[in-house]
Regions:
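Short alpha-helical segment within the cytosolic histidine kinase core of two-component systems
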Residues: 45-57
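Short alpha-helical segment of the dimerization/phosphotransfer core of two-component systems
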Residues: 8-13
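Conserved catalytic submotifs in the C-terminal HATPase_c
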Residues: 34-39, 56, 61-71
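Short beta-strand/loop element within the Bergerat-fold HATPase_c
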Residues: 97-109
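Short conserved segment of the HATPase_c
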Residues: 122-136
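Conserved glycine-rich
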Residues: 164-165
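Short helix-loop "hinge" at the ATP-lid/N-box region of the Bergerat-fold HATPase_c
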Residues: 90-91
């Protein structure tokens, strides 16, 4: 048991170091992320397909509402990581037999990617801090959801680097919705 415990602690330390290095790399001011025309619908579909097995393991329904051919100027790799991170987070906190929705909308002014989970909500006093490094609400500090509180901080930095904005709302009626917005 002691060896297993030590191995688990070493693995968690490695994950923490990896996340901190990723955040430091993203925050480097002198790096310009190359932007190109990317079909957001295609990236959103790929992200959801990659996470279907995780949803299945948790008995969570992963639904999508995507529009066809939604092209914007962005970075494909960053966008894929952003959507995947938000979906993983939603699946992590959605209770068994719950639902997660990935929705894409676009009008003449903006493109929005929304990830919504309907079960677990974030307390109003925690909302201003969800993108802070190492922040975890008291509700999320369980052994079931091991994390360091860096995932959303990394996601926010990535969104900023590709000229998007990220926001979150949470209430018992709608659940928790993370929205990534790109101006057109």
């Amino acid at each position: 048991r002691w060896i297993d415990s030590s191995q688990m602690a070493a693995k968690r330390m490695q994950q923490l170091i990896t996340q901190m290095l990723k955040l430091a790399d993203i925050e480097r001011k002198n790096i310009t992320i190359p932007l190109e025309e990317v079909d957001v619908s295609n990236i959103a579909m790929k992200s959801s397909l990659q996470l279907e097995s995780l949803a299945y393991e948790k008995s969570v329904t992963l639904d999508t509402e995507l529009i066809q051919s939604c092209v914007i100027q962005t970075n494909e790799d960053y966008l894929m990581q952003i959507i995947s991170s938000l979906l993983e987070n939603a699946l992590k906190y959605e209770p068994q037999n719950g639902k997660v929705l990935l929705k894409l909308t676009q009008d003449k002014h903006k493109t929005c990617i929304c990830v919504q989970n309907f079960g677990t909500t974030i307390a109003q006093e925690d909302l201003p801090h969800v993108f802070d490094r190492f922040y975890r609400s008291d509700k999320s500090r369980t052994n079931e959801t091991e994390s360091f509180g860096l995932g959303l901080a990394i996601t926010k930095e990535m969104v900023n680097k590709i000229h998007g904005e990220i926001s979150v709302t949470s209430n018992p009626q709608e659940g928790t919705i993370f929205t990534v917005t790109f101006q057109r």
